[in-house]
């Protein structure tokens, strides 16, 4: 009986220590799709605007035509804009954890980091390579 209690206790501890991925795949797929659309608008605005953007948030606002409703699904997260010469990308982060990374120059959502071990919220894509 002592061994059974010990085994059950160990299993309980292991189950508690292994925290399941807290992100729902369906919700993350929806967010990735919306982020992809915004990233494409971001990239197009950067490439075809007469404005030389150095500030990511200004580029984001111009890309969504100041329609902040497009950002509502991301309210519990942080969106970071990456500008690398004539290319742009978006990072979706949960505090300092990178969830999704999307280069606006590609048709698909580029990196679904939320499925992997936690990564720091910083760009991992080399836009000069991805976008050429």
Residue ranges and their predicted role:
Residues 4-13:
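Sec-dependent N-terminal signal peptides
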Residues 10, 87, 99, 114-115, ...:
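Processing junctions and N-termini across compartments
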Residues 17-19:
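Bacterial signal peptide processing site
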Residues 21, 98, 110, 126-127:
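Mature cores of small secreted peptide/protein domains
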Residues 24-50:
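N-terminal alpha-helical signal peptides/signal-anchor transmembrane segments
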Residues 40-43, 47-104, 109, 131-132:
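Extracellular/periplasmic head regions of type IV pilus-like filament subunits
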Residues 114-132:
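Short, low-complexity, Pro/Ser/Thr/Gly-rich segments in the mature regions of secreted, periplasmic
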């Amino acid at each position: 009986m002592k061994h059974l209690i010990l085994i059950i206790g160990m299993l309980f501890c292991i189950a508690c220590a292994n925290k399941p991925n807290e992100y729902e795949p369906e919700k993350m797929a929806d967010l990735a799709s919306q982020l992809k659309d915004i990233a494409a608008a971001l990239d197009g605005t950067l490439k075809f605007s007469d404005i030389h953007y150095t500030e990511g948030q200004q580029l984001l606002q111009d890309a969504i035509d100041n329609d902040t409703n497009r950002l509502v699904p991301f309210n519990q997260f942080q969106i970071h804009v990456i500008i690398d010469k004539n290319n742009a990308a978006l990072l979706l982060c949960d505090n300092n954890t990178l969830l999704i990374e999307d280069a606006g120059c590609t048709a698909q959502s580029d990196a679904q980091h939320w499925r992997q071990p936690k990564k720091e919220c910083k760009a991992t894509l080399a836009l000069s390579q991805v976008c050429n």
